[in-house]
Design a protein with these regions (language model features):
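Short proline/glycine-enriched turn/loop motifs at strand-loop junctions of beta-rich domains
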Residues: 57-61, 183-190, 286-292, 861
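Conserved alpha/beta catalytic core and glycan-binding cleft of carbohydrate-active enzymes
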Residues: 373, 377-380, 384, 611-612, ...
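C-terminal motif of bacterial Sec signal peptides marking the signal peptidase cleavage site
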Residues: 16-19
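C-terminal beta-strand-rich structural cap/linker in extracellular carbohydrate-active enzymes
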Residues: 345-346, 877-897
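Substrate-binding/active-site clefts of carbohydrate-active enzymes
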Residues: 396, 409-589, 602-619, 623
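The feature marks proteins involved in alpha-glucan
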Residues: 39-57, 84-85, 92-175, 213-278, ...
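Bacterial signal peptide processing site
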Residues: 21-23
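Carbohydrate-binding surface patches
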Residues: 275-291, 818-860
């Protein structure tokens, strides 16, 4: 922590010391004009700058500034002192680089904590000041920058800060369990009154002393004997003593929402959504704060008009007519109504009224299908959605360590002209399972699409998001997007169906997809994004329960997702939603697992309960894993996050191992020129994280291979080909061999093995490292590359077959401790043995990187039979002194009977 003393204070101190010594002469800075004793000096050049910071609660000791120059490290700085505006901190130009006054300085105001402790930012945005666009004060030679808490604007002039109510919130005292209303002001008041729906219930002129916890000129803490009515509005008015002005504020309930008393009163563990039978449908929605809910039932999911990119678009066949039904508020804040008729195929919405929204129409968060663009939920009879033979479809219970996961986007598999399937089915669920497609070039024909995946041999496909996204689903206007913009979690995305207007079609076609893959021995894992929504404002969650479902930092949405908001899995009703949602999706669509985006934003308790529910109530072998990190700073306490550092707390789920990825190729956030063990050819690379990954990440991510997913590439960042090329490798043969070497280690490691679709033939996105909304062409699987790189494809086939069929990669954590990984003197060669006790084979694995080593790269393969040589050397003879070339993998086996 750096503390810079006030420049003004230093100057004044110098003058004071001079006076004490009897020396009355002083010298002014060279850039100040000489004046008489009665004139103020005037600065002709600036000497520094001052940040001024105002908080209505005057809590300056709890905050500091993080400041950095462009391209340099930052530091924490405490505020020097306070004045009539607030806290301030002053710097001399001498504290910074010589040219700073001609440039800019970056800053964050945050809680006075280390970054490792997840300090809350005053505003989420990183801000900066460009001095050349400002004027300095000629009175003191300083640029003055004025900041206000909660306001991201950077001001160049002093802002008005008047009398304010600085706190108006209900909370719970966790020692006494009392519910209290806490009111604070920044100036003395003569009167405070609280009105509930217009009726005065508290006045400082007539207080019930038995309920007063504290009463001063600037603060009132008042006890409530029971839970306040959270559907009412509590208006606080404060009359300020000095001016007589009256300020008002609405009391917030947000601090109650995580309390035991709130959960006792409002947590609901029953069914929610449209509960359908042919005789009647009951609608249930949780909204304790609302004063009115109206159910609207439509004949169609298509409105007369939709808004796309700010423009109104008319839809053929659209209809805005609906039947209206008033809902009744019951226990736990659940609103319900029952319609005694068969509503299958109808669509519905809720119109919600509370203190934040008036008759705003939303889709039920529990809706299970929808019409075009997810604007109206659908009432579904799921018995009408099952394809022939659906009852015979069952998730194949593979051991999770035998999983070979193939990550693919619905559109990518079929968007290339080289797919050669039915043109109308390209980019759709139907195209994803269309059989008998191929591509021919010259005299060579290769399988494409679904047949390509079957030929490759993977046993699991992980689909990029297929839930309903905030996209325009019209087939004639659809554009590519990864899909990390959630709209309706329990609804399938309509743009992948042949008819996005009919909520039944997407369900039927996706079930056909699952069935086709199941018949091919391939399970489906769904990528889920519960950590944020596309837009918090007017989202169905926020409309139903403002300030409950999301995390906040100083009144603004916390942005740990990097997408503008983050959901609060630690709030019991959102935890319930995640658990209910995954159970529905896994059960109805016969999914084998889930991949959680930015899982670090979810608390471990939620993930543990979710995993237990799926294992107990859906499938004991269901696979659950996620990204064990966040996308930014979150307000969720670090020891609660489902991140790598808390892996020992995970129960029934695992996470990606980015450590083996970075050790091999320096992926993720590394500079593109950084090199790993695979791509570094000129110096020795570390092997620690590689060895850890091979044995289930025992020493780094914990000692349980059932909790690790080993990989080198995924949809994020570069493809493997592009990543190697970005590191400066230009020779095509070298790139090919490096790519195969990287995934050879992945597919022969303990734990789940994961790959990005297309790596089996060196897929490229033309160097695009973030193709989330790039063109279909950038993201397509180009099957001409399969012909070009058939040797790569063949190597992947063998690696995948070995992973799945040899009894080598389902070791317990105790067994993994006994695996011995060997390497040569400089680590350019790694080799080890595994025993298949069931089939009585000993396998030997050897991997050589591209470092031109002077150390031995000899491995004893005497008596072994070759299974795989990734370089396909025609003259290779296994012996007691087999020499591996650079970038070569040799796998061989022998009988141990």
């Amino acid at each position: 922590m750096k503390k810079i003393f006030s420049l003004a204070f230093v100057l004044l101190s110098a003058l004071a010391l001079a006076s004490c010594s009897g020396n009355t002469e002083t010298s002014l800075p060279d850039n100040a004009k000489t004046t008489t004793s009665t004139e103020k000096k005037e600065y002709t050049e600036s000497i520094g700058f001052t940040f001024h910071y105002y908080r209505s609660d005057a809590d300056y000791s709890s905050y500091n500034m993080w400041i950095w120059e462009n391209g340099k490290e930052g530091n924490d700085y405490e505020f020097n002192d306070t004045d009539d505006y607030g806290a301030y901190i002053t710097f001399s130009w001498n504290d910074w680089s010589a040219n700073l006054k001609n440039g800019s300085i970056n800053f964050i105001v945050k809680e006075a904590k280390a970054w490792a402790d997840n300090p809350v930012k005053d505003v989420e945005k990183d801000r900066y000041v460009t001095f050349s666009s400002m004027e300095f004060s000629k009175e003191d030679g300083l640029y003055h920058i004025y900041l206000k808490s909660g306001d991201e604007t950077v001001y160049g002039v002093k802002q008005e800060v008047g009398e304010e109510i600085t706190k108006s919130q209900f909370n719970v005292d966790y020692d006494t369990k009392q519910i209290r209303l806490n009111i604070q002001t920044n100036k003395d008041v003569s009167l405070i009154e609280v009105k509930k729906d217009g009726t005065t219930i508290i006045s400082t002129n007539n207080l019930d002393d038995s309920k007063v916890i504290k009463n001063t000129d600037t603060e009132l803490i008042y006890k409530f004997d029971e839970m306040p009515d959270i559907s009412s509005k509590y208006i606080i008015s404060a009359t300020f003593r000095e001016t007589g002005k009256i300020k008002t504020a609405v009391a917030s309930f947000a601090n109650l929402y995580s309390s035991e008393v709130f959960n006792n009163n409002y947590y609901y563990d029953g069914d929610l959504g449209a509960l359908y039978t042919k005789e009647a449908t009951t609608f249930k929605v949780w909204s304790p704060v609302s004063t009115m809910l109206e159910l609207r039932v439509y004949d169609t999911g298509t409105p007369e008009k939709i808004t796309v990119n700010g423009k109104s678009v008319s839809l053929a066949g659209g209809n805005n007519s609906y039947k209206s039904y008033q809902m009744t508020k019951g226990e736990k804040g659940v609103w319900s109504t029952t319609i005694n008729e068969d509503l299958a195929g109808k669509y519905y919405t809720y119109a919600v009224t509370n203190s934040s929204y008036k008759s705003l129409e939303i889709v039920d968060p529990y809706a299970k299908s929808a019409g075009i663009n997810g604007l109206r939920g659908m009432i579904v009879d799921f018995n009408e959605t099952n394809p022939l033979g659906w009852d015979d479809v069952n998730v194949i219970n593979y051991d999770s360590q035998s999983l070979t996961v193939y990550e693919c986007h619905i559109a990518d598999l079929t968007s290339s002209t080289t797919w050669n399937g039915t043109a109308s089915k390209a980019k759709t669920y139907q195209g994803f399972y269309e059989a008998s497609t191929s591509y021919t070039s010259g005299n060579t024909t290769v399988k494409t699409g679904f047949d390509h995946i079957k030929e490759l041999g993977v046993n699991t496909v992980q689909l990029l998001p297929i839930f309903d996204q905030a996209n325009d689903e019209r087939l004639e206007t659809r554009s590519f997007n990864w899909g990390y913009n959630p709209l309706n979690y329990n609804v399938l995305e309509g743009s992948y169906s042949s008819d996005p207007y009919d909520g039944y079609v997407r369900i039927k076609e996706f079930k056909e997809l699952v069935k086709a893959y199941n018949e091919a021995g391939i399970n489906i894992i769904m990528d889920v994004v519960y950590n944020h929504v596309n837009s918090l404002a007017k989202s169905n969650f926020d409309v139903l329960m403002p300030n409950y479902y999301f995390r906040y930092s100083n009144g603004s949405a916390s942005n740990g997702s990097g997408c503008g908001n983050e959901t609060a899995s630690d709030m019991l009703m959102y935890r319930k939603f995640m658990i209910d949602s995954t159970e529905f999706l896994a059960s109805e669509y016969k999914l084998s697992g889930f991949r959680f985006d930015l899982m670090g934003l979810h608390d471990v308790t939620t993930m543990n309960e979710l995993a237990k529910n799926l294992h107990d109530n859906v499938n004991s072998s269901i696979t659950i894993y996620g990204e064990p990190w966040t996308g930014g700073t979150t307000t969720l306490t670090q020891n609660l996050q489902a991140t790598q550092s808390n892996l020992s707390k995970f129960e029934g789920f695992g996470c990606f191992n980015d450590k083996i990825r970075d050790a091999l190729i320096k992926g993720g956030l590394a500079a593109k020129t950084d090199k790993g063990w695979i791509t570094e050819t000129k110096k020795i690379s570390t092997t620690t994280d590689i060895i850890s990954g091979l044995i289930g990440s025992q020493t780094i991510l914990g000692n349980d291979p059932y909790k690790t997913v080993n990989y080198v590439t995924c949809h994020d960042n570069y493809t493997l080909y592009d990543r190697i090329k970005a590191a400066g490798i230009t020779d095509e043969e070298t790139i090919k061999n490096m790519a195969v070497l990287a995934n050879s280690l992945v597919f022969t490691s303990q734990g789940i093995s994961f790959m990005l679709s297309g790596e089996e033939f060196l897929r490229t996105k033309g160097g695009n490292s973030n193709s989330y909304n790039a063109s279909y062409q950038v993201n397509e699987l180009d099957y001409s590359l399969k012909i070009k790189n058939m040797d790569v494809f063949n190597n992947y086939q063998k690696l995948i077959a070995l992973k799945q069929n040899a009894n080598l990669f389902a070791r317990s954590k105790e067994e993994c401790k006994n695996i011995t990984i060997n390497k040569n003197n400089d680590g350019s060669l790694i080799y080890f043995d595994l025993i298949d006790n069931e089939n009585k084979f000993q396998y030997r694995f050897a991997y050589s990187n591209g470092y031109k080593s002077t150390a031995s790269k000899n491995v004893d393969f005497n008596g072994f039979t070759l299974y795989l040589d990734t370089l396909n050397k025609e003259d290779l003879v296994l012996s007691s002194d087999t020499v591996l070339d650079e970038l070569e993998v040799i796998i061989a086996y022998k009988s141990i009977e």
